[in-house]
Amino acid sequence: MNDSEFHQLADQLMLYIEETLDGFTGDSDIDYETNGGVMTLTFENGSKIVINRQEPLHQVWLATKAGGYHFNYRDGHWYCSRSGEEFFAKLSEAATTQAGEEVSFSE
């Protein structure tokens, strides 16, 4: 993949997250902000999730209270370089924990 393809895929990922949060109907207030390719989700309890694109590596990084994860794109999805877990599964798990209620980003 070249840099242009990477940015297109990362943009699609972040847009999907924004659209999902805009449609979230739970009790928790989850704010998001995107600045310079970094998306920060902020939860009512003050905790944060940070999603960051790493252009030189063509990776998307996810930082949660539980730890940091690096994702590579293959076969139409982003997968963790260590566990093989799919990005939206890991994001849903982390957001659910940090929001205190179910938050699903499943496609």
From Swiss-Prot:
SUPFAM superfamilies found in the cross-reference section: Frataxin/Nqo15-like
Annotated GO MF terms: ferric iron binding; ferrous iron binding
UniProt keyword Cell inner membrane, yes or no: no
GO cellular component: cytosol
GO biological process assignments: iron-sulfur cluster assembly
UniProt superkingdom: Bacteria
Alphabetically ordered keywords of this record: Iron, Metal-binding
Pfam family, one: Frataxin_Cyay
SMART domains: Frataxin_Cyay
Family that this chain belongs to: Belongs to the frataxin family.
HAMAP family linked: CyaY
Role summary: Involved in iron-sulfur (Fe-S) cluster assembly. May act as a regulator of Fe-S biogenesis.
Record's protein name: Iron-sulfur cluster assembly protein CyaY
